[in-house]
Amino acid sequence: MISVMQQMMNNSNMPPPFVKSSDSHETHDESPTSPFIKRSDSPATTSSAAAAAMQHNFWSTRAAQLQQSVSGSSGVSSGSSSSASNNLSRTQADNHSERGSDTASSPQVAPLPTSSGMSMPAAAAAGMYPFNAGRFPTEFNMMVNQSMYNDFYSNSLAASSWPYSYPQQYPFANYSMPSLDGNLNDGGQLEWTSSSHAMRKKRKPYTKAQTLELEKEFLYNTYVSKQKRWELAKYLHLTERQVKIWFQNRRMKDKKQKQRTSGDPTGMLMPPGLD
């Protein structure tokens, strides 16, 4: 564009076409039908010089404006590209600063080696394995926080009512067991006994005097009638049921003795007419 404008400026300084110059001695009485325009060799007038100067100034000004516009557009493009690059660098710097602040605020935990070649933070290992590490290899001892292990078991032992030095292993260890020091035949009931057992009366053994009187009656009558049963119960301060049960047990005992001595499998025959 600039080269074209300069060429046009150069062409403006050339004389216009179809102009014929003539000497001063020639006359101007030629025919008006001549295709050429005569020009005298006299110096140019003031008006033609001013017009040529104005035309030259116009094209010079136009060329300068074009150069300024081209340089301005290139400057704008370069400025926009530089501003974009500055924004990108500023964003990257902000990201690096944020990453640095996060890295500085986060605690740095040194990794610990394990038997498999992997690394694990010590805090995570102590939280995941709160038990005794003595049963495991030496590499495993490095992952367990011994102070945390001691606090865990000491707190558990202090919170419980376990009377021994070692901690409880079962949740039902706090259950109080009943005392078994006393005699079980003293009529005391355990906690897990049912109510039906508590309703049963205590077994009372027969005294020697009662046993002697019952043995005398058994020598005469193996089976006792209701009247005799009532008399014995009243005399010996027993119930009729106790008298009846004693005679049943005594007959069974006598039957076994006779079977051992005589070998009779049937035993003693029951006398007729007795209950």
UniProtKB/Swiss-Prot annotation:
Which parts of the sequence are annotated with region: Disordered? 1-53, 70-116, 250-275
Database matches in CDD domains: homeodomain (cd00086)
Spans of biased composition, class Basic and acidic residues? Answer: 22-31
Q: Which compartments does it reside in? A: Nucleus
> Which InterPro entries is this protein grouped with?
HD, HD_metazoa, Homeobox_CS, Homeodomain-like_sf, HXA10/ABDB-like
- Gene3D superfamilies, from UniProt? Homeodomain-like
Q: Indicate, by first and last residue, each region the UniProt record lists as having compositional bias (Basic residues).
A: 250-259
Q: Which GO terms describe its cellular component?
A: nucleus
Q: Which UniProt keywords apply?
A: DNA-binding, Homeobox, Nucleus, Transcription, Transcription regulation
Q: What is its main location?
A: nucleus
User: What is seen without this gene?
Assistant: RNAi-mediated knockdown in adults has no effect on their F1 progeny, but increases the frequency of posterior morphological abnormalities on a homeobox nob-1 mutant background. However, RNAi-mediated knockdown in L1 larvae causes defects in tail tip morphogenesis, which are exacerbated on a nob-1 mutant background.
The record's section on SMART domains has:
HOX
UniProt record, GO biological process: positive regulation of nematode male tail tip morphogenesis; regulation of transcription by RNA polymerase II
Low complexity biased stretches: 44-53, 70-89
**Record-stated family:** Belongs to the abd-b homeobox family.
Task: Give the protein's recorded name.
Answer: Homeobox protein php-3
Q: Which organism is it from?
A: Caenorhabditis elegans
Its lineage opens with: Eukaryota, Metazoa, Ecdysozoa, Nematoda, Chromadorea
